[in-house]
Amino acid sequence: MDQQPIQVIGGGLAGTEAAWQIAQAGVPVILHEMRPKRFSPAHHTEHLAELVCSNSFGAMASDRAAGLLHEELRQLGSVVIAKADEHAVPAGGALAVDRGQFGQDLTQTLASHPLVEFRRSEVPAIPEGIVVLATGPLTSPDLAADLHRFTGMEYMSFFDAASPIIVGDSINRDIAFMASRYDKGEAAYLNCPMNKEQYLRFREELCKAEQTELKDFERETAKFFEACLPIEELAQRGEDTMRYGPVKPVGLSDSRTGERPYAVVQLRQEDKAGQLWNMVGFQTNLRWGEQKRVFQMIPGLEKAEFVRLGVMHRNTFINAPQLMLPTLQFKQRPTLLAAGQLIGTEGYTAAAAGGWLAGTNAARLALGKEPLALPPTTMLGALLEFISSASPKHFQPMPPNFGILPDLGMKIKSKPERYGRYRDRSLADLSSWKHNLN
């Protein structure tokens, strides 16, 4: 008897990873993606795993939370991280990718797998059978309504924003200089330096600039994810807030003058050719005309050409602690699994990681095996333990971080040493866990 295919709904990072893991386990899978027939407010291409915000997966070093999760996923055979490594662009200590090549390659890789059936169609309701929901924070209205009926719970939400992207040739290289903070790695960022007068004038105009209006129901519940605040929100919080955030000058000096600027706007390479540059930390909800006016006040960007201006969108997520198990199964229907931002994990790497486990467990269910939960001493295990056991009343999206890992059982004052111990324990426990899998 032919095996029934597992259905994965959503072709983002989580869904792409889930579908790949299912197929690699020898189980047929149908991957549904509604683009290009229908686009969400944040998507622009029909490629799988489109990166709608930054092109960075975070720090590469494995003694950083994101970097540790990268390394765990490499050990687990993640296709998303493998392709990110393959299409990496210079970004100092971060893993950033050429988003066009990255998305195209993943699309071709999935479409060419003999056990993957790729359907460009919208799914209006949760199907029967084994299903992985990976529809992200911008789930289509019909499916969102069906999920609401299934859970009997209201969605939670926050607002997320994307940064502008600039044509490299339009940046004044007589002003902007190449460097990485603390000279880590190769000089990978373009840095636009500001003196105090320029910074204060820029902040003043940023605070006065017109924003895109939120709808009434959005304004009443407006809540931002703290790690992705609009730059204008930071500017309004205080004179020096931006200088302790995205425009902090520490670790940077202009080699031409030997001086440390008062503030620095960093641009990160978007593509391998170096033709496109992303304004790091400049997520924004300003009107498009205002973005051009204010951002062209930045030294070196006076004639900047924008290929994409910043946008903001509302992200919804379910109350995972009430609904989910650490295996990423729904408590009330174990054959329904979910991953990605829909369940409240935050960030690209966390989405791919959740997709890995959801896909792996969906395949195990189809093969008559018990679903897996990762050791809580690993970054992925700790993250999924958190989202399935946090306080439902106060649940908010969570990125990978060392604060969710179990205590080491010893006091280590040095942060680098402490994080190194977390890393060593995590990778050792993951290796042992993998060795004992059946």
Curated annotation (Swiss-Prot):
Pfam families: GIDA (PF01134). It comes from the Bacteria. Its EC number is 2.1.1.74. One of its GO terms (molecular function) is tRNA (uracil(54)-C5)-methyltransferase activity, 5,10-methylenetetrahydrofolate-dependent. Gene3D superfamilies: FAD/NAD(P)-binding domain. FAD binds at residues 10-15. InterPro entries: FAD/NAD-bd_sf, MnmG-rel, MnmG-rel_CS, MnmG_N, TrmFO. It is an enzyme of class 2 (transferase). Coiled coil: none annotated. The keyword Transferase applies. It catalyses: uridine(54) in tRNA + (6R)-5,10-methylene-5,6,7,8-tetrahydrofolate + NADH + H(+) = 5-methyluridine(54) in tRNA + (6S)-5,6,7,8-tetrahydrofolate + NAD(+); uridine(54) in tRNA + (6R)-5,10-methylene-5,6,7,8-tetrahydrofolate + NADPH + H(+) = 5-methyluridine(54) in tRNA + (6S)-5,6,7,8-tetrahydrofolate + NADP(+). Keywords: Cytoplasm, FAD, Flavoprotein, Methyltransferase, NAD, NADP, Transferase, tRNA processing. It is found in: Cytoplasm. Catalyzes the folate-dependent formation of 5-methyl-uridine at position 54 (M-5-U54) in all tRNAs. This is Methylenetetrahydrofolate--tRNA-(uracil-5-)-methyltransferase TrmFO. It comes from Trichormus variabilis (strain ATCC 29413 / PCC 7937). The lineage of its organism: Bacteria, Bacillati, Cyanobacteriota, Cyanophyceae, Nostocales. The gene is trmFO.
